[in-house]
Amino acid sequence: MSIVYMNVMLAFMIALIGTLLYRHHLMSSLMCLEGMMLAMYIFISLISLNMHFTTMYMVPLIILVFAACEAALGLALLVKMFNYYGNDYVQNLNLLKC
């Protein structure tokens, strides 16, 4: 396994650990999720280009679409939460309240 693949997997693992450790604020959780999506995009792009999988050339674009949707929904939730509560603490997100 080359050093590029190792670096991409390390970036994914660091973003995953960041998601687990810094879950106090919603903004830091969203940034770690974006880091994970970016690492997945780079990894799948490298695999599809190096292995010449012609059927997988569209998969990185689909991942980018999902990452953009996730970012838009996350930022909309962040703005709504900040307007309602005045902070971005994840502990304020309670799905049992209606």
Swiss-Prot record:
Membrane-spanning intervals of the chain: 1-21, 29-49, 59-79
Cited InterPro entries: NADH_UbQ_OxRdtase_chain4L/K, NUOK/Mnh_C1-like
Organism domain of life: Eukaryota
Gene Ontology biological process terms from the UniProt entry: ATP synthesis coupled electron transport
GO MF: NADH dehydrogenase (ubiquinone) activity
Subcellular location: Mitochondrion inner membrane
Keywords from the named record: Electron transport, Membrane, Mitochondrion, Mitochondrion inner membrane, NAD, Respiratory chain, Translocase, Transmembrane, Transmembrane helix, Transport, Ubiquinone
A single Gene Ontology CC term: respiratory chain complex I
Membrane topology, from the record: Multi-pass membrane protein
Pfam families according to UniProt: Oxidored_q2 (PF00420)
EC number: 7.1.1.2
Major site of localization recorded for this protein: mitochondrion
Function in brief: Core subunit of the mitochondrial membrane respiratory chain NADH dehydrogenase (Complex I) which catalyzes electron transfer from NADH through the respiratory chain, using ubiquinone as an electron acceptor. Part of the enzyme membrane arm which is embedded in the lipid bilayer and involved in proton translocation.
Family listed: Belongs to the complex I subunit 4L family.
PANTHER family attached to this UniProt entry: NADH-UBIQUINONE OXIDOREDUCTASE CHAIN 4L, NADH-UBIQUINONE OXIDOREDUCTASE SUBUNIT ND4L
Quaternary structure and partners: Core subunit of respiratory chain NADH dehydrogenase (Complex I) which is composed of 45 different subunits.
Protein name: NADH-ubiquinone oxidoreductase chain 4L
Species for this entry: Hemiechinus auritus
